[in-house]
Structure formats: C-alpha cells, structure tokens
C-alpha cells in the first residue's frame, strides 16, 4: 500500500515525517478531492492486475485546525468538493484540534464564525455528505491517515473485488 498525498497539501511535514520514520510508502499526486487516499501497485496475488488508486472509494480531507475549517465553511469551493465526495464509500474530515466539539462551542479558534452556527454546520456536513469528522492531535495525524487507508484496503481485500 502506498499513501497518496495531494500535491497542493500544505504544512504536512509532520505527516510526511511520520510516514518516513515508520517506513510507510507515500507519493505525491494531484487528487481531485481530499488531501489523502492510497494506491496499490500491481499485485496479481491480491487481485490487482494494474496499479489501482482508491480515489473513487476514499477521500481524507485534513484541516490544520478549527480556524481553517471555520474559514472554509463559507467557501463555495469547499462545499463543492464535499458534494463531489458524496458517492465515495469512505469520507473523512480530520481536524488537528484536541478539544474538538468543546473548542467549537467555547469558541477556541481563530475566526469570528458564530460557535453555534459552526457546530451546526459541521453536523450538517456529517449528515448531508456522510462525512466522518475526527479531531486529533497533530502528532497523531500520520497514524490516523495510515490506519484509515489500511482499514479501507482490508475491507476491499476481504469483502469486495475492485
């Protein structure tokens, strides 16, 4: 398995460092949606007759904090990107913010977006787009991305043919 990082993903040195320190294969490639997914190089034993990119099955969007996502909520481009992910089986929004929902309600973010509106908007995204929203420390982001990709791969190998 090789993690695919979008070429426009910024400030992800901590994630790349995690991959390198744990000898996780990765490559940079333009992704239409999301910041991360994965690919499987050709492997006849696993049933992959060619390189296979899981871009139709998985989208992982990463935000560097609540301030960034609060700014994106009002951006039509962000809404359009979420809409394009609707048919993917697995969609994740990973936010580097330990306090999560509590930090939203208590307005612990760098944006003047109303906390109740912010809280409601994220829950609307969860329901409308089937999005899994996870809050985690920056230091755990690489592990989370790898774990999600590995879990999706296991599901497809064990339960479905690509």
Please give the residue ranges for each predicted region.
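Conserved catalytic cores of phosphodiester-cleaving nucleases, focusing on short active-site segments
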Residues: 58-64
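Non-catalytic C-terminal interaction segments of nucleic acid-processing enzymes
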Residues: 1-55, 67-162
């Amino acid at each position: 398995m090789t993690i695919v990082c979008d070429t426009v993903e910024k400030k992800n040195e901590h994630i790349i460092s995690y991959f390198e320190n744990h000898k996780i294969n990765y490559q940079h490639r333009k992704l239409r949606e999301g910041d991360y997914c994965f690919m499987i190089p050709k492997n006849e034993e696993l049933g992959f007759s060619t390189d296979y990119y899981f871009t139709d099955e998985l989208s992982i969007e990463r935000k560097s904090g609540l301030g960034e996502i609060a700014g994106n909520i009002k951006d039509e481009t962000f809404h359009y990107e979420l809409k394009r992910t609707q048919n993917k089986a697995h969609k994740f929004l990973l936010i580097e913010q330990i306090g999560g929902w509590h930090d939203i309600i208590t307005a612990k973010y760098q944006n003047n977006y109303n906390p109740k509106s912010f809280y409601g908007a994220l829950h609307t995204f969860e329901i409308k787009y089937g999005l899994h929203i996870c809050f985690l420390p920056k230091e755990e982001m690489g592990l989370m991305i790898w774990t999600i990709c590995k879990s999706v791969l296991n599901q497809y190998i064990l339960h479905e043919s690509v």
